[in-house]
A protein has these predicted regions:
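Extracytoplasmic/periplasmic, Sec-exported soluble proteins
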Residues: 3, 7, 50, 59-63, ...
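Ligand-binding pocket segment of bilobal, Venus flytrap-like solute-binding proteins
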Residues: 1-45
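Sec/Tat-exported extracytoplasmic proteins
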Residues: 1, 19, 34-37, 60, ...
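Mature extracytoplasmic/periplasmic domains
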Residues: 50, 59-119
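Short amphipathic alpha-helical segments
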Residues: 54-56
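Non-transmembrane alpha-helical segments in soluble domains
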Residues: 12, 16, 24, 69-76, ...
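Conserved C-terminal helix/tail region of periplasmic/extracytoplasmic solute-binding proteins
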Residues: 115-144
Length: 144
């Protein structure tokens, strides 16, 4: 096998046409592609993976903090959070929203991995002292 590309989305058409047999991707993207081709599957490496989350924040300089709070509160409504989870394939930490999800979404292990799978995963933290090293090797890797 060979490395086909280092991009965030070039794998999509390649895996759907069969030009790739494996790709590293975000779980939400994998779910989207699996909806197009149910013969594909998502696997979390047995060694684990990185954990990530999207967050909503309000900058201290926000021109309309009240509007920002209203938006966040809207996004946190269980019915809205459940729809976001279903439509975008992003897991929700909102327990009330989770309870509104259909069984096929609740049982989707790419959205809601088992506790044992999560124990093998870890969050990513910034390592400013390593940025120059990462940048040097990434440039070497991605430039061929």
């Amino acid at each position: 096998g060979a490395i086909a590309a280092f991009t965030s989305d070039a794998w999509r058409p390649q895996i759907l046409t069969g030009d790739l047999t494996v790709a590293m991707c975000y779980s939400a993207d994998a779910n989207e592609v699996i909806r197009e081709d149910p013969n594909l599957d998502y696997a979390l490496p047995t060694s684990g993976s990185s954990l990530w989350m999207d967050t909503l924040v309000i900058p201290i300089t926000a021109p309309n903090p009240a509007g920002a709070y209203a938006w966040i509160n809207f996004m946190l409504r269980p019915d809205v959070a459940a729809r976001i989870c279903e439509r975008l394939s992003f897991a929700t930490p909102n327990r009330e929203a989770y309870n509104l999800l259909p069984p096929e979404v609740k049982n989707n292990t790419s959205l809601f991995p088992s506790e044992s799978a999560l124990e093998r995963c870890e969050g990513l933290i910034p390592l400013p002292e390593a940025n120059a090293i990462y940048d040097r090797y990434w440039t070497k890797l991605s430039s061929g």
